[in-house]
């Protein structure tokens, strides 16, 4: 995003990176579900659904609280950051100690 100089360019960069992080999250989620027994699989699915609901509500709040011309960028960065952090969290569960 260093080369992005306009709000539109920054938004595009955020969207692109969010898509990459979402693919990463989906990939590790699928890997983890195949590794888990049925009980923990269900727990992961339930937790992941709740996490998505929380992420979306939290980032919507960021947009509302920020206001102004950069509010949408703030919301996009929120989704990006939370998605990246969740992917890393699931990767740590999938491969502890790495």
Whereabouts are the PLM-identified features?
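N-terminal alpha-helical modules
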Residues: 1-98
């Amino acid at each position: 995003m260093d080369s992005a100089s306009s709000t539109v360019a920054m938004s595009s960069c955020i969207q692109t990176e969010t898509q990459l992080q979402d693919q990463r999250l989906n990939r590790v989620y699928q890997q983890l579900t195949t590794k888990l027994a049925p009980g923990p699989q269900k727990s992961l699915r339930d937790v992941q659904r709740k996490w998505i609901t929380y992420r979306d509500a939290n980032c919507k709040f960021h947009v509302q609280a920020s206001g102004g011309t950069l509010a949408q960028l703030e919301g996009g960065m929120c989704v990006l950051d939370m998605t990246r952090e969740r992917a890393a969290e699931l990767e740590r569960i999938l491969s502890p100690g790495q």
